Design a protein with these regions (language model features):
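ATP-binding N-terminal substructure of ATP-dependent carboxylate-amine bond-forming enzymes
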Residues: 1-84, 93
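Active-site nucleotide/adenylate-binding loops and adjacent lid/helix of ATP-dependent enzymes
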Residues: 2-8, 72-75, 83-146
Length: 146
């Protein structure tokens, strides 16, 4: 029987639903708070009880990212893999990845100093939206209309 482990740092409806659905489908399932996990560079898969498949559901980008890296290093099958988190958690890398695959996206400028950001704004005009490379939920996003 396949064992699924849902790892979270805040239980929301989705984590409960994933756990409940796995149980209803006849899978062995567990749910673990990532904040209580400790792993070291000598940790072995056989000593950790994460089952066959780990569904990484951390809200904290960096907690989830590095937990995925550790679990993958030990050979666990992780859904929401390190590489996906690394790419999708970084707006610059996401934009470059989408452009490389010819996925249509809004024109995006990357500035590496405040001065170069101002130069881009002066060149392109208004409105503009300034965003940090890392971040979610609208934190640090500044729409500038004029």
């Amino acid at each position: 029987m396949v064992e699924v482990c849902v790892v979270y740092d805040k239980v929301r409806f989705e984590e409960k639903a994933l756990y409940d659905t796995a149980k209803k489908k006849g899978l062995k399932a567990q749910i673990i708070d990532a904040k209580k996990i400790t792993i070291n560079n000598a940790s072995k898969r056989k000593t950790l009880q994460f089952g066959d498949v780990v569904l990484q559901r951390c809200i904290s980008h960096f907690r989830g990212l590095y937990l995925s890296a550790c679990l993958e290093f030990m050979g666990f099958m992780v859904i929401n893999k390190f590489k996906v988190g690394e790419t999708c958690g970084n707006k610059l890398i996401t934009s470059l990845t989408l452009a490389k695959s010819n996925v249509p996206t809004p024109k995006t400028h990357f500035a590496f100093s405040a001065e170069s950001a101002i130069e881009v704004i002066n060149t392109t005009g208004f409105p503009v939206v300034l965003k940090p490379i890392i971040g979610s939920w609208g934190r640090g996003v500044f729409p500038i209309r004029d």
